Each structure stands twice: as structure tokens, then as C-alpha cells.
Amino acid sequence: VRDAYIAKPENCVYECATNEYCNKLCTDNGAESGYCQWVGRYGNACXCIKLPDRVPIRVWGKCHG
């Protein structure tokens, strides 16, 4: 498990406005919790706490969406 920005298959973050949206997205994918990181490295993006290794995360490189 790891704390990370959850990613779509094309290495793009899930953009967000609320913590509730991200918490649901993250917990639905097996994380302990989630939050909306405002004005972070990838803009307003969902970050997950203790996200399982099987779930894709945002890695270095371009978003191909």
C-alpha cells in the first residue's frame, strides 16, 4: 500500500473540488481514505491514503488523456 495520487489508466489524475468525492473514489478502490489536494503538483487532484498496490497511481511523465 502507499499514499499517492490515484490515476486513470492514461496516467491522468482525477480532478476534484471536494474531499467527499475523493474519499469515496479512494475508499471504493480499497484505500483507507482520500482527500482533494488543492493547487498541488497536478492541480486539484485526488490523493489516497493507504491505496492498494494494484490500483494505478500518477507517475512521472505525461498524462495521455
Curated annotation (Swiss-Prot):
GO terms for biological process: defense response. Pfam families: Toxin_3. It is found in: Secreted. GO terms for cellular component: extracellular region. GO terms for molecular function: sodium channel inhibitor activity; toxin activity. Gene3D superfamilies: Knottin, scorpion toxin-like. The keyword Chaperone does not apply. Binds to sodium channels (Nav) and inhibits the inactivation of the activated channels, thereby blocking neuronal transmission. This is Neurotoxin BmK-M3.
